[in-house]
Amino acid sequence: MSITSLPRAAGLRSDDDNPPPIHNTDDLRIKEIKELLPPGHVIREFPATEKAATTVFTARNAIHRILHGGDDRLLVVVGPCSIHDPAAAREYAGRLALAKREFESELVIVMRVYFEKPRTTVGWKGLINDPRLDGSFRINEGLRTARALLLDIAMLGLPTATEFLDMITPQYIADLISWGAIGARTTESQVHRELASGLSCPVGFKNGTDGNVRIAIDAIKAAASPHHFLSVTKAGHSAIVSTNGNEDCHIILRGGKTTNYDAASVDAAAREVAAAGLAARLMIDCSHANSRKRHENQIEVASDVAAQLARGEQRVIGLMIESHLNAGRQDLVPGVPLEHGVSITDACIGWSETTEVLQTLSRAVQRRRVAVADALG
């Protein structure tokens, strides 16, 4: 067919020229579409208080200074693998808020509050997606529950961290988040890099599931640049978002085919980051591949990193730990009551082990200060 004989675009035809198509080609695999509450509606229900905003502002500034060499404390993102029970999360937050104050001279403690879970295949996708854990997928309820929980935790003076998985959810909760993560499965995703470029909080990018650090380096460079992408406004309208870029992004070493928390791995990663023209500021994920998927190994990882810090290692700026009220994990089985304070996703260390790890890290920071001072003469 020649160019001149191509049919006119549908939008240029008259109604007489454009009868309804015989074949339906739209939404063929869509079962149902429900209205989503606008972000502004949920925010008005649970508005940020002055104390909550101060908690977030103070923590973001502290993390910014850590990332740029202005604060020698250690960032510790610690908490449950995922939130499935808001009551247990509030209990955990109450304990962690006390620990935050106890160790605040050495540690910037941020509670891990993950509402969305990326799945390798299928499974429970988190509190926002299915807040009742029963397959009812009451997402509007999940968004309300998530924001209410974040607000309560911020009111304790405890900052929070979460993983961002889509372009819409941040409009509901991001003002209450002090630090964000982009996971190993999504670090290479263009839309997640674009999202990170516009987030108001510092963001950590995990290395790839195979241990590849390069994709996280590329992600940091991309997120530092301005972007234009599609999302929604606070009123819930489709929108084009233009960003300034995020200078507060860094790498999280989470392991891959092997672990990468030891001194040699840290040095190799730091050199690769520096060779790319970026500041060598690394966070260590004590769980996932670094723990070889055994929650108790997180203690070993944290101890190894603490020893590196005590020897004067300054390129490690933070750790991530999966911790809950009680150790281990449990399966989500319909009709079977859940044990209080036990994860239903990845296994976690318990609270007593958590306090021991925090004490170890606090002492390590103190020793690092001495080592750095001695090195300076």
Report each predicted region and the residues it spans.
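Conserved, mostly hydrophobic/aromatic
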Residues: 79, 284, 350
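Conserved phosphate/anionic-ligand binding catalytic regions in large, soluble enzymes, centered on
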Residues: 75-88, 346
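Gly-rich Lys/Arg/Thr-decorated short loops/hinges at beta-loop-alpha junctions or inter-strand turns
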Residues: 38-47, 243-255, 338
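Internal helix-turn-beta structural module
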Residues: 324-369
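Active-site-facing alpha/beta catalytic cores
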Residues: 5, 20-27, 93, 106-261, ...
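Polybasic, low-complexity association/targeting segments
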Residues: 2, 7-34
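N- or domain-start disorder-to-order transition segments that initiate the globular core
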Residues: 27-68
